[in-house]
Amino acid sequence: MKRRLVCYALAVVLSSSGQPSNAQEPTGLAASALGNPAFTWLRRSVPGFRVYILADSYPARYQDSLLARLPSAARHAEAMLQIEPLAQPIDLFFIESREQMTQLIGARATGFAQPSARAVFLVTNPTWRAFERHEIMHVIAGQAWGRPGPNTDWLVEGLAQAADGRCGSFTNADVLLALATRRGWIPFPTVLTEFRNQPDLRAYLQAAAFVDQLLGRFGPTPLKELWTRGAAVDSVLGGMTLMAIEEEWRAELRETARLSDGELAAIETKGCG
């Protein structure tokens, strides 16, 4: 019995390690998910995260490897934005289907973030990888930079997809170039003002590759200003308008790997997962 109590105490210490003593209780969709009687959660913890894994599921079988990816995803986002870690943990949920996502958030998706509640929901299964870098960036950017201004959907999603960094086994830019060759480019003013009405794959990758260019060229500070104040084609970074920067970037963008017709067709059918 004594040995059993010692083991239990050790498990409690391990499960709570890495969290601040003043950690806030889950809120928003995280609190709703934890209170949903249709779901049984395995509770784990790694630095910066309280993790909830659907019991008897695909992610439950691979929970150690999934958890190991989370701290590096947060560090990656922090490095991109050049910020300190969040003071409070992110509540992150692993599930295995879009149907389960609909039950939890009311929408059919494979990844979802609620930055105001520091909540992330991720689908992963044998045919779909978890997009932890994408959704974690949503939370970290939202917490660090605040509420995004007008005409910034492209920046919000571009930053998140830039954090993920790839589509299938290719870079965002390589898939974008293949799509642009086949489907054409989305005009930048349209990306800026009508982002949510564009084809998801093309819009997300075009925004991601452009945001990646902006970060590398100007750093995060001007992007934070765009995020906060809102963006327009004549917004100025480094003495150039966004429109001029985008035109120059598009003309100079080059592929590092070429997709076959079959590889591009598979991505168009399945998506980046």
Show which residues each predicted segment covers.
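Cleaved targeting-peptide boundary
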Residues: Q24-L29
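Juxtacatalytic substrate-recognition/specificity segment
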Residues: A30-P148, T152, A232-L237
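Bacterial N-terminal signal peptides
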Residues: C7-S16
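Amphipathic, positively biased hydrophobic alpha-helical segments used for protein targeting
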Residues: A9, P59, F93, L122, ...
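Boundary at the C-terminal end of the N-terminal hydrophobic targeting segment
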Residues: G18-A23
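Positively charged n-region of N-terminal signal peptides that target proteins for export
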Residues: M1-R4
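Acidic/His/Gly-enriched intrinsically disordered linker/tail segments
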Residues: A107-P115, T124, F131, R147-G273
